[in-house]
Regions:
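Glycine-rich, proline-tolerant flexible connector loops at the mouths of alpha/beta enzymes
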Residues: 32-55, 106-118
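N-terminal small/glycine-rich loop or linker at the start of catalytic domains
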Residues: 1-9, 61-74, 106-115
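Catalytic domains of carbohydrate-active enzymes, especially glycoside hydrolases
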Residues: 19-39, 90, 96-98
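A short acidic, helix-capping loop that chelates divalent metal ions and anchors anionic groups
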Residues: 68-74, 110-116, 153, 186, ...
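Active-site-proximal loop/turn and secondary-structure-junction residues that shape catalytic pockets
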Residues: 9-11, 37-39, 65-68, 108-110, ...
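Active-site acidic/histidine proton-transfer and metal-coordination neighborhood
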Residues: 54, 77-176, 188, 258-266
Length: 279
């Protein structure tokens, strides 16, 4: 397995100013970085890809729908079309960057609720969007990994089983699921068993502790997580995802109101040391 870290620990938009951070990540021994793709031009992400190539860092990309005007499960077909266009753009950015994966909750706008559980129409619309995006992804050599969240952030997909069922419905080789241990800690009765049940559908893993701080400093049993991944033959990426207060808009979006670690660099150092002992 390769170990990576999500750049959301530092920023929502990676620019040339972050090259020293990327160099530090490489020096610490990370194999890859996860780049958030929320705004900007495709050409910019091609530049980011070249910086990472020069450093010898592989990359994945993360996404989210945040604008109600681009909602995969809106009753308005024009709004759903805008969501598909956004996901196509994110796939194009990943391809330009040389990233093999786009990961995230690609099924609804974050934090937007209807007051009820998912409807048949919403599930159908979300599957239609993914099926359409999968063709673009396949042509770009990109895999889409559906990220289940939790009931406080979404209503459509909160467990690995629901993500797996949805992937089966989409039925495309470029679509799979991912594990995020923070969300699983909230929603799964047994995270390790959920991983074993999802099995071959798992394409990506976020290592994130219960307080979004340093992995291993909280309550989650990462040993059980890694053993479950070993049991299904998973040999993909483990990406550290943590959030702090350095970027106010990210702190607000992730509801991080207190410091849970000394510094981002210290977290990155401690996280790779912690994960390396399991691999």
């Amino acid at each position: 397995m390769r170990i990576g870290i999500n750049m959301l620990l530092w920023t929502g938009q990676v620019t040339e100013a972050h090259r020293p951070t990327l160099e530090m990540i490489k020096t610490l021994g990370y194999d890859l970085v996860e780049i958030p793709v929320m705004s900007g031009a495709v050409a910019h992400y091609a530049d980011v890809g070249r910086w990472l190539e020069d450093l010898g860092l592989s990359r994945t990309t993360s996404m989210a729908f945040t604008d109600p005007a681009a909602d995969p499960i809106s009753p308005d077909p024009d709004v759903r079309r805008a969501a598909l266009e956004q996901l196509h753009w994110q796939i194009d950015c990943a391809h330009a960057m040389g990233a093999a994966k786009v990961i995230g909750p690609m099924f609804q706008v974050l934090g937007q609720f209807t007051g009820t559980g998912p409807t048949d129409d919403e599930l159908r619309w979300a599957a239609e969007l993914l099926r359409a995006a999968a063709s673009r992804a396949e042509g770009s050599g990109v895999t889409l990994a559906i990220e289940p969240l939790n009931r406080f952030e979404c209503h459509l997909c909160c467990t690995l089983e629901s993500a797996r069922a949805w992937s089966r419905d989409v039925d495309h080789p470029s679509v799979g699921v991912m594990v995020d241990t923070f969300h699983a800690n909230i929603e799964e009765k047994d995270t390790a068993e959920a991983i074993r049940s999802a099995g071959e559908w798992i394409r990506h893993v976020h290592i994130s502790d219960n307080d979004r701080g340093t992995p291993g400093a909280g309550q989650i049993d990462f040993g059980a997580v890694v053993r479950a991944l070993d049991s299904i033959g998973y040999d993909g990426d483990l990406v550290v995802e943590a959030f702090g207060r350095a970027t106010p808009e990210l702190a607000a979006a992730t509801r991080v109101w207190r410091d849970t670690f000394e510094s981002a660099e210290q977290l990155a150092r401690d996280a790779i040391e912690f994960l390396s002992k399991w691999l």
